[in-house]
Amino acid sequence: MVVVGKIHEMKDIVKKLKKEGKTIGFVPTMGYLHEGHLSLVRKSKSQNDITIMSIFVNPIQFGPNEDYDRYPRDFERDKNLAEKEGVDYVFYPSVKEMYPDDFKTVVSVKKITDIMCGKSRPGHFDGVATVVLKLFNIVNPDRAYFGQKDAQQLAVIKQMVKDLNLDVEIVPCPIVREEDGLAMSSRNTYLSGDERKSATVLYRALNLAKDLIEKGERNVSKLKKAMEDLILKEKYTKIDYIEFVNYDTFEPISKVEGKVLIALAVFVGTTRLIDNIVVEV
């Protein structure tokens, strides 16, 4: 496995691989790898000749009072995990390398960023879209792999790829969960023991909504209320949002029909966690 820190070096490597007719799968990450990330690597390896992973904690997708400085980082650990999974190249640039002093461009996907995490974290998805477009231009992948856990991020990236005619196939991958249902996340490391127990309520609330829908409930405000009641029974919880949106358009809905994404963000202590499920009626 080769670690590459410079953009021009990564681009040269990619040019050579493309000349040899190799297909490239790309797994963009912010590091502190967990089983969710590794499942993306396995998927990439099964579909491409070469797998490139980026590890870059992207400062421009964090708000002023968010956790950029304390976001967990352990490059040695990540490198070992990536190597063990058979990643071919790790692109590990510095902030200066990605954003030199004269950097002036922002990529902004409208409308689908007005709700959910886009509303709670203004500017977040501009930061995501900008870094992902930059990474796509550096790595020039045939396919790129994203977890369904960040459902809104996935929608934003799909929209950007479509609108800007990018030659990359976006491959969504299922959420990987702990045994008790908690969606795997690098931010789970922030939770205390008691908070960790409370955190299972996100998935329980999503499943409660799913069960109620299966029993015939279609009214979104009633479903939200049931989820809120369950979540707020737990200690340490504060709801950021619960949203029901059409899976394809990302439009908020008031009645459950067709394919629906149910997504939520909940603070457990000071840690903001997200999760979602898809239901079809």
Swiss-Prot record:
Misc. remarks from the entry: The reaction proceeds by a bi uni uni bi ping pong mechanism.
UniProt keyword Amino-acid biosynthesis, yes or no: no
Amino acids binding ATP: 30-37, 147-150, 176, 184-187
Keyword Nucleotidyltransferase: no
InterPro entries for this protein: Cyt_trans-like, Pantoate_ligase, Pantoate_ligase_C, Rossmann-like_a/b/a_fold
NCBIfam families linked: cyt_tran_rel, panC
Coiled coil regions in record: none
Cellular compartments per GO CC: cytosol
Residues where beta-alanine binds: Q61
Reaction catalysis annotation: (R)-pantoate + beta-alanine + ATP = (R)-pantothenate + AMP + diphosphate + H(+)
Catalytic residues of the enzyme: H37 (proton donor)
A Pfam family of this chain: Pantoate_ligase
Residues involved in (R)-pantoate binding: Q61, Q153
Protein EC: 6.3.2.1
Protein family per UniProt: Belongs to the pantothenate synthetase family.
Entries under Gene3D superfamilies matching the protein: HUPs, Pantoate-beta-alanine ligase, C-terminal domain
Function according to Swiss-Prot or TrEMBL: Catalyzes the condensation of pantoate with beta-alanine in an ATP-dependent reaction via a pantoyl-adenylate intermediate.
Pathway(s) annotated for this protein in UniProt: Cofactor biosynthesis; (R)-pantothenate biosynthesis; (R)-pantothenate from (R)-pantoate and beta-alanine: step 1/1
Record's keyword terms, sorted: ATP-binding, Cytoplasm, Ligase, Nucleotide-binding, Pantothenate biosynthesis
Source species: Caldicellulosiruptor saccharolyticus (strain ATCC 43494 / DSM 8903 / Tp8T 6331)
Gene Ontology molecular functions: ATP binding; pantoate-beta-alanine ligase activity
Protein's name in the database: Pantothenate synthetase
